[in-house]
């Protein structure tokens, strides 16, 4: 029996399950602020004499198995701080719109930038050969990671390294998010991306993710921060009791 032609039929596909990951780029100005201040903090040339690699060591607060992770606390001028927050909360708000367009949340979950709270401080990771970030999640509602310095040697390792070039999943230095049932037919439980300089990813803070180590004798620099939802927090403060009865206004 010859199957009937598809022409004339309505065929639709849906992706109703799983989270949304948004990828875009940061501005040149934001990139310059984040990388310059991080490098100054690290090499002891930061204009703020009260911060250094000891005062801003952030490793005990993070899951990463890295030798250098620093917070940006005290690293920005007031003008820089306002610029950083404005751009990142704008992008985080756009993430809520993207989630709505992907039919993951209702329209009343879309937020403006002033309804997004950035959880300070931001932090920077200097990732070196053999270091990694184990599977973990973050606090808040939304998380992001952006890449400030990405050496070409890491991508070359995936293409030409003896340990990676024949693999069907070359993953040196790559980031992977995981969700749901791995191995289910017609489904994917993981999403792997290759970091690119100035690229930034937004995703649910509770979404598990990890970063694979690389062997190349080089160093990659990334920045992360989390965000909360001002509307949700205000509503939570108005609730009481086990059933979350809302306070009458």
Stretches with model-predicted labels:
Residues 178, 226-249:
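Double-stranded beta-helix
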Residues 212-222:
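Ligand-binding loop in jelly-roll beta-barrel domains
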């Amino acid at each position: 029996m010859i199957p009937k032609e598809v022409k004339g039929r309505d065929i639709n596909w849906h992706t109703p399950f799983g989270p949304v990951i948004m990828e875009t780029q940061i501005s040149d100005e934001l990139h310059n602020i984040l990388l310059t201040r991080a490098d100054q903090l690290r090499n002891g040339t930061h204009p703020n004499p009260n911060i250094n690699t000891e005062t801003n060591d952030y490793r005990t607060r993070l899951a990463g198995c890295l030798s250098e992770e620093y917070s940006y606390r005290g690293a920005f001028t007031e003008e820089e701080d306002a610029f950083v927050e404005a751009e990142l909360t704008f992008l985080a708000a756009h993430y809520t719109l993207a989630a709505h367009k992907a039919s993951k949340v209702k329209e009343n979950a879309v937020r403006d930038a002033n309804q997004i709270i950035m959880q300070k401080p931001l932090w920077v990771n200097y990732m070196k050969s053999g270091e990694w970030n184990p599977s973990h999640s973050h606090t808040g509602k939304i998380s992001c990671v952006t890449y400030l310095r990405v050496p070409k040697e890491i991508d070359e390792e995936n293409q030409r390294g003896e340990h990676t070039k024949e693999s069907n999943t070359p993953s040196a230095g790559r980031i992977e998010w995981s969700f749901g049932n791995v191995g289910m037919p017609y489904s994917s439980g993981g999403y792997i991306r290759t970091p690119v300089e100035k690229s930034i990813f937004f995703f649910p803070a509770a979404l598990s993710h990890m970063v694979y180590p690389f062997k190349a004798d080089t160093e990659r620099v990334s920045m992360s921060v989390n965000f909360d939802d001002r509307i949700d927090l205000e509503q939570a403060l108005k609730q009481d009791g086990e059933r979350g009865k809302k306070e009458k206004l």
